[in-house]
Amino acid sequence: MKPTVPFLALALLVQTASAENWPNWRGPNQDGSSSETGLPAKFSTKEGVKWTTDLPGIAASVPVIWGDNIFITAPLKDQKKLVGLCYDKASGKEKWRTTISEADEVQWDDKSNLASPSAATDGERVYFLFANAVAAACDFSGKIIWKRDFKETHGAFATQWTYGSSPTIDSDKLYIQVLQRNETFQFQGKFNKGTEGKDMSSYVLAIDPATGKDIWKHIRPSLAAVESLEAFSSPVFTTYKDQRLMLISGGDTLTIHEAATGKEISRVATWNPPGDGYNKFFRLVPSPVVGDGIAIVCAPKNSPVFALPLDAKGETQPIWQTEPKGVTSDVPTPAFYKGKFYVLDGGKKLLSCLEPKTGKVIWTGELGGKTKFESSPTVADDKVYCVNFWGEVYVAKANSDQFELLSVNEMGNGSKPNGNADSVRASISVSDSSLFIRTQDKLFRVGK
């Protein structure tokens, strides 16, 4: 008997509902994890690939997924455009591309470009933000609903290296984090950072997703100075004891806020105190991660990992920190999965598993390879997925008492960049029992 139209519609609805979305750069739980199962441990550009599509430009932004849609940002270098794109999840075909900004330059330094921030979606609209401070909301057909240039109202972002914080949707607000220097400066004698006459304080901005208008602006004070004021992390949200919280890392500290108002509740005592020995080059990259009532933050440049309880009040000493020259992460954001933190030291190529309450290191294992990791680990189906500059995906066992490397999978285009803007920095996204892997010039769907 032929299926009826209502039956087919119901089947499609059930299939769509069963697939977990990846609505922002760190996924459905904002911790790099997914509950999806049936994910592959071994694959290549020719093995286990459901589809491959060419991308118009490389960026550190991850594939953001909602239903049948995959959203990414990209620079069009020759056309000097910054675009938002949508691909069909089932086929990989491009549905639309929308120009958000036409810029004089799409790249300001040799490490990244202006499309580094990932998109975010609430299932109704998709939100794009670029490092030149231009943001827009589009509907799912690619039509721009609103567009703003934050330079006009809040000034250009004043970070030495290209701004990379991703927008985050939580409840009824769109959040933009700008942790920046407190004065204007010029980078490489060419690019002006910050805007004269504007307040150069670091801040978090809450925006109405429907209109793009400011709801509130929270100034986020810090004792940091010079480059240590800068952060490339993104806001993280969690609920603890019936209170919705926002976590911000950077400026030599981790702070916890009321999500609804931005009011600061607590902060970890600084890892970089003012005075003799102060390091003014401690820019921060990793975002905070939450698990089992504990928030962790990775201090910069081989410094320890620090932990703060979510119920802390005021300035609080960390409840634990890793040993000096021990577990650390300068760039990748850790993940949380099934009661454990997973911390990737991208420079030394070491993956560690930590117990949240005590910081006990359960295991540390060497991934290997000949180049660094600056993408963040993704954990799902009892596997940890880490991708390096060359597009090599290392798969390790998660939810295990000991380190076990399961496979190394070549997904790059054969080039061997070593930290320049052509290096793979996008973390892996997960949905519908598949991995979505962005490399130098392609997007892969690997799995079912």
Language-model segments: what does each one mean?
Residues 18-448:
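Noncatalytic, solvent-exposed loop/strand surfaces
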Residues 1-2:
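N-terminal secretory signal peptides that target proteins for export/translocation
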